[in-house]
């Protein structure tokens, strides 16, 4: 769980960095991290089935984020959303658009919160 927490902090900081180049965000570094944590790239199908448009729309994610408690599901959604920009988007630079950045920041913040909560509970 500590590795998931560190992943969420690391990538949250990257997405918050106003000076980061899009290549750093769409290069395979995130994929390597996600795969090593056991997250699955499923084109956001599982997350979309449960949360609909929140799988790729920031405003929808804002409305349901507190309902998200499944760490592997959220991690896989982050991985799959990243893969869209890495592989399918017209331009990988779209990942830098404010609404896309905001989606990742919100999802990563929730992942950080859930993993930290899990770490604390396991220490009790």
Regions found by a protein language model. Give the residues of each.
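Short, charge-rich amphipathic interface segments used for partner binding and complex assembly
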Residues: 94-113
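N-terminal regions of proteins, emphasizing targeting and processing segments when present
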Residues: 13, 82, 123-124
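Short terminal alpha-helical segments
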Residues: 1-48
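Acidic, low-complexity, intrinsically disordered interaction modules
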Residues: 31-55, 59-100
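Short intrinsically disordered terminal tails
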Residues: 1-2, 47, 113-124
